[in-house]
Regions:
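Conserved acidic residues
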Residues: 80
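Class I (Rossmann-like) S-adenosyl-L-methionine-dependent methyltransferase catalytic domain
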Residues: 1-15, 20-63, 67-74, 113-197
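Structured loop/turn residues at beta-strand edges in well-structured enzyme cores
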Residues: 77
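A short glycine-rich, Lys/Arg-flanked "PGG" loop and its adjoining helix->strand segment in the class I
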Residues: 98-110
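A conserved beta-strand element that flanks and buttresses the S-adenosyl-L-methionine
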Residues: 83
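Conserved catalytic-core motifs of eukaryotic protein kinase domains, centered on the activation segment
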Residues: 93-95
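Short catalytic micro-motifs in class I SAM-dependent methyltransferases
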Residues: 86-90
Length: 197
């Protein structure tokens, strides 16, 4: 995802920096960064997707991909860069969205940066039925053009002003926000770069 690389370059995230991806899916960004020598831990809810990431890396980096439930699991440590591409919009309930932001705040180093990308054009709002969230479904992997089992998603799209409010209510400071159009598989997305308040 270009925004991940742009943020790494702009904020001078180095190969020695500790990087955390929230919601790695099929591993596109984490695998790319690992291949470039970055120190990445990629967390993903779907065990099938985690196993696919390990397979795609020929199990060279098995400890860099971990099945993880952001709503329940705990993780030690702080990270210099945390990024999440197209994940926050899957959390529909306000308390889940708050847990997501609190998780970032808890694990971001005092000088660290976080990149949060959400579906949406910055203006429209939408909320789906949460009863079908996280059921496993089959889809074609964009990396290998084969069928894989992944977690289906729910969707909550918010306007930029409403996202700014919820991010800042978690003691995070938004230092950049914009609409981007270069996230693979999405039309327009809201992009936020944050740091601890």
């Amino acid at each position: 995802t270009p925004a991940v690389l742009n943020t790494i370059n702009k904020y001078k995230i180095t190969k020695d920096s500790k990087i955390l991806e929230l919601g790695s899916g099929e591993g596109r960004d984490a695998i790319f960064l690992l291949d470039k020598g970055y120190n990445v831990l990629a967390l993903e809810y779907s065990i099938s997707a985690v196993n696919k990431c390990k397979e795609l890396t020929n199990n060279k980096s098995p400890n860099n991909f971990k099945q993880f439930d952001l709503m329940q699991d705990t993780l030690p440590g702080e990270y210099d860069f945390i990024y999440s591409v197209a994940v926050i919009h899957m959390f529909v309930e306000e308390n889940h969205r708050q847990k997501f932001y609190n998780f970032i705040h808890e694990h971001l180093s005092n000088t660290g940066k976080a990149l949060i990308i959400s579906m949406g054009n910055g203006k429209d709002e939408y909320k789906s039925d949460i009863n079908t969230a996280f059921n496993e479904v089959e889809r074609t992997s964009i990396n290998i053009n084969k069928k894989v089992i992944v977690a289906s998603t729910s969707c909550r799209i918010k306007s930029i002003p409403n996202m700014l409010k919820e991010i800042e209510s978690s003691n995070l400071k938004v230092i950049e926000n914009k609409i981007i159009e270069d996230v693979p598989g999405f039309d327009k997305c809201c992009c936020f770069i944050v740091e601890k308040n």
